[in-house]
Amino acid sequence: MESVERVNLLGLDGAALSELVGQWGGKPFRARQLQRWVHQRGADSFDAMTDLARDFRAQLARDCVIEALPVNTEQRSSDGTRKWLFDVGQGNAIETVFIPEDDRGTLCISSQAGCVVNCRFCSTGHQGFNRNLRASEIIGQLWWAKRVLEAAADTARLPGGKAGEDTRVISNVVMMGMGEPLLNYDQVLPALRLMLDDNAYGLSRRRVTVSTSGVVPMMDRLSQDCPVALAVSLHAPNDALRDELVPLNRKYPLNALLAACERYLAHAPRDFITFEYCMLDGINDTDQHARELIQLARQVRCKLNLIPFNPFPASGLKRSPSARVRVFAQRLMDAGIVTTVRKTRGDDIDAACGQLAGEVRDRTRITERNATRTIPIQQVHA
């Protein structure tokens, strides 16, 4: 007799959980209770859900699990950034990064193991593509981090959000980790809905950001299904250069991308799109590039976020000097373009932008470096 795979409750959004509970004859309020236990209280045992009927808990224990990916290691940066390495099987891993700041706590999560887009400046893309993550594996990163951070005495707390907490540790979630979220849309969508659900994490749409390299048809779908803040990996002001840096541009060139951004803004929670621009020495950082970028940015309401490149050997690229970045940023601001320069965080644990999973396949380097700076997971369990 074949065993039936149990349902992982982490991956069910409110509608799917209500449907499951309804199949057992349960009322919608039972699904909401269950959702609060799983996502707000971080329960991983049905026995702990003492306000649920005993027979309902028994049904859950038979048919369901609450299970995140196994965590191999946690690393802490000197600047307070924390990174978890999750095992996705077959020798592959994904990474999740928590970035604490005075006014926010941002969790950067992954949507794929590896990435198929293969941007030239991104270490993650150079590792190749393994598989899409399931919704339970995507939201499981938030579930895990919330439990661990709330249990840590040294984690700063911020004013609460819609979900009813007096305080919260994670105030923002960005899908800027491994993978292209919009190429795993069917699994990303329920995860986003859980992030926004008042019975789960209760985050504002303005505080959840999906970053895309420009999958135009799925940008349009997201604007209808679950419009959250949008960041676009731009990195070049013209098609010829972007074709080289972001190969997806050959399928969805800049004219199509900018038109999709304009359509998205009609539904977006913010009145601008964030354009991410990785600063590469001599490649996309000249005065001419700045002039072209100004012309492009004037076509859509946007903010430019300049990102210092994090070098890795296989790229053959170098980071723009700090002075060049400052001049480039000033050119944009003088033209009236809202511009920020991203502060690098966690680069001593390879948690900075473009570095995720850069060591995942290099087991020797991982072992050597973890021996000196990794915190054993058993010390940080909630």
From Swiss-Prot:
GO terms for molecular function: 4 iron, 4 sulfur cluster binding; metal ion binding; rRNA (adenine(2503)-C2-)-methyltransferase activity; rRNA binding; tRNA (adenine(37)-C2)-methyltransferase activity; tRNA binding. Keywords: 4Fe-4S, Cytoplasm, Disulfide bond, Iron, Iron-sulfur, Metal-binding, Methyltransferase, rRNA processing, S-adenosyl-L-methionine, Transferase, tRNA processing. Reaction proceeds by a ping-pong mechanism involving intermediate methylation of a conserved cysteine residue. It comes from the Bacteria. It comes from Bordetella bronchiseptica (strain ATCC BAA-588 / NCTC 13252 / RB50). This is Dual-specificity RNA methyltransferase RlmN. Pfam families: Radical_SAM (PF04055), RlmN_N (PF21016). One of its GO terms (biological process) is rRNA base methylation. GO terms for cellular component: cytoplasm. The gene is rlmN. It is found in: Cytoplasm. Residues 101-348 form the Radical SAM core domain. Its cofactor is [4Fe-4S] cluster. Binds 1 [4Fe-4S] cluster. The cluster is coordinated with 3 cysteines and an exchangeable S-adenosyl-L-methionine. It is an enzyme of class 2 (transferase). S-adenosyl-L-methionine binds at G179, E180, S211, S233, L234, H235, N310. InterPro entries: Aldolase_TIM (IPR013785), Methyltransferase_A (IPR040072), RlmN_N (IPR048641), RNA_MTrfase_RlmN (IPR027492), rRNA_lsu_MTrfase_RlmN/Cfr (IPR004383), rSAM (IPR007197).
